[in-house]
Amino acid sequence: MTETLKTGIPAVDRYLGTGYDQVRGFSSRYSATICGHLLRRQSELGIRGSVAEIGTFEGRFFIMLGLAVGEGERAYGFDLFAWPGSQVLERLLANADAHGLARDRFTPLSFDTGKLTAQEFSNLTGGAPLRFIHIDGDHFPKALTQDLRLSLIHI
């Protein structure tokens, strides 16, 4: 018998159990579960702050992030929202609505992180250190290096 892994965050566990596979994306449920568990553990230890995802796409992993953050925290989602078509942002918003992620808990940001300075990234994410950043944007070395650089400065 295989036991399903849980994060310990009821809203996240519900989403992972019944909604995750309904949202188009590339991140595995396993990775989302492990990251959700990490976010819960951070909260238990008093580590607070907003979170971000670079490469939000239609929200598969991002919805988990948004459901995991606590009161006064936000999820920031960076994407161009243009691939594979022009309706990606609308699908993200519809997916968030369908899976219980309230719009006042997240901010989709249509920016190319490869062109952002550290200060611009900080301004867009509230100016405070982020407690978690998921990088799943452009996978080419130059772009990934830039995303890692932005993340390292803001964690």
Predicted regions and their residues:
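S-adenosylmethionine/decaboxylated-SAM
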Residues: 4-29, 36-153
